[in-house]
C-alpha cells in the first residue's frame, strides 16, 4: 500500500489515550509558536537549530517515519503525506511542514505552512496548485482528526516576504506554498485556507477535469 495508507492503518490502531497525549504535545508546541516571535523564513531555505529540531521531530511522529498526517486536495487529485521539516529529501517525496509554523491540527491562533515542489520530474506534488481557486477545499488528516479548509486567499510573493504566513489572532489558517512561475521558480505561490466544518462528501468530489469541460 501507499505511504498514506500505512499511516491510516497505524493511526486507526492507536489507543485514544495515546492519541490525546500526542495531540496535547502538538497543541503545546503551537502555543509556543504563537507566543514566540520567530520570523518565518522562505520554506525553501529553512535552517533551524539542531536541538530545537530534535524536540520538533518527536512531536506527531507516531511511527518514526516523520509523517505527521496527510493532505488531500480533491480538485487537483492530491493525496500526499505531510512530513516534518522542509529538507530536500522530504520535498522529493511529499509535503513538508515549516517547523517554525503551527502543526496542522487546527485551533484558534494557528497557521500551519505546508510546502511542496512544483515541476519535479519524479512526482507532481504541488505542480497543479496554480489550478486552485478561491472556494476550493483541502483536507488534512492527522491521527484521528479530519480538518477541512476553504481557500480564501491566493497570493504570489517574493520568497523573503513571509507576512502572509503569520498567525492572525483568533484564526485557524493553513497555507500551501510552492515555487512559481513554473520553470523559473523565483516567486512563491501562497494558497491560504480558512478552517471550515468537515463534511466527508466534500472530500469525495472528483477532480476538476479541465479538458472535458466543454465536451
Positions of PLM-derived features:
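Solvent-exposed, non-transmembrane regions of membrane-associated and secreted proteins
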Residues: 1-133, 137-215
Amino acid at each position: 500500500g501507499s505511504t498514506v495508507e500505512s499511516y491510516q492503518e497505524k493511526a486507526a490502531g492507536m489507543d485514544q489515550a495515546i492519541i490525546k497525549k500526542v495531540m496535547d504535545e502538538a497543541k503545546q508546541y503551537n502555543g509556543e509558536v504563537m507566543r514566540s516571535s520567530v520570523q518565518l523564513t522562505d520554506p525553501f531555505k529553512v535552517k533551524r537549530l539542531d536541538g530545537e529540531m530534535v524536540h520538533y521531530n518527536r512531536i506527531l511522529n507516531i511511527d518514526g517515519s516523520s509523517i505527521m498526517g496527510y493532505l488531500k486536495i480533491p480538485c487537483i487529485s492530491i493525496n500526499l503525506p505531510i512530513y516534518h521539516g522542509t529538507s530536500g529529501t522530504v520535498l522529493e517525496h511529499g509535503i513538508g511542514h515549516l517547523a517554525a509554523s503551527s502543526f496542522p491540527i487546527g485551533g484558534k491562533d494557528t497557521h500551519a505552512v505546508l510546502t511542496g515542489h512544483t515541476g519535479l520530474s519524479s512526482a507532481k506534488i504541488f505542480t497543479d496548485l496554480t489550478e486552485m481557486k478561491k472556494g476550493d477545499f483541502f483536507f488534512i488528516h492527522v491521527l484521528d482528526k479530519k480538518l477541512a479548509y476553504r481557500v480564501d486567499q491566493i497570493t504570489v510573493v517574493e520568497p523573503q516576504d513571509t507576512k502572509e504566513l503569520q498567525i492572525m489572532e483568533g484564526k485557524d489558517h493553513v497555507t500551501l506554498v510552492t515555487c512559481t512561475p513554473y520553470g523559473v521558480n523565483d516567486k512563491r505561490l501562497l494558497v491560504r485556507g480558512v478552517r471550515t466544518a468537515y463534511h466527508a462528501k466534500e472530500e469525495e468530489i472528483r477532480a476538476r477535469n479541465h479538458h472535458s469541460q466543454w465536451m
